[in-house]
Amino acid sequence: KFWKIQYTNTWTWLRDVRPEVTVDGAFLTKYIANHYLSWNVSKRLNVGLFESVIWTNSNDRGFDVNYLNPVIFYRAIEFETGQDAGNAIVGASAKYKFNDNINAYSQFVLDEFSLNDIKAGNKSYKNKFGFQLGAKYYNAFKVKNLMLQAEYNQVRPYAYSHNSIVLNYAHNNQSMAHLWGANFRELVLIGRY
């Protein structure tokens, strides 16, 4: 954390526990690297950028030291190492504090983007993205400890997936993004007292 900026890097290993991808009786190991850059633009506004990449231990590659790079732009490393070398996503987030009681937040994630397919207007599966819009209302209607939350989430089909199935965003058969994985729309309404 420095000034109004917070920067986080994480690296870890994951397991693909599907029987069809075992290697010598052991579950397949894959790795993930993440960057998250958050900036408090003002006392009310926070914006963030993030990226993540998953890769496998193909050809005894192991943990790829290229992904120790502390600077954002994993997509360039993924491109340099080959199409099936990894699965990268990028995204942005924002949070705005209207007052002490009301916050709005959003997030956008981009897995794959094809401008030609957007121009064609055919709703191509190649454009894989998701977004979230939400708001929280603390001490709602001046009732102490009453919190109300409304959130809309939408993720296009095949987001977080890859041509090489082992490069999907999952660990121990659980989605790492949303319980429903991809291809969904949901409205979440929460009230707590």
Enumerate the predicted regions with their spans.
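Signature for the C-terminal beta-barrel architecture of outer-membrane proteins
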Residues: 2-191
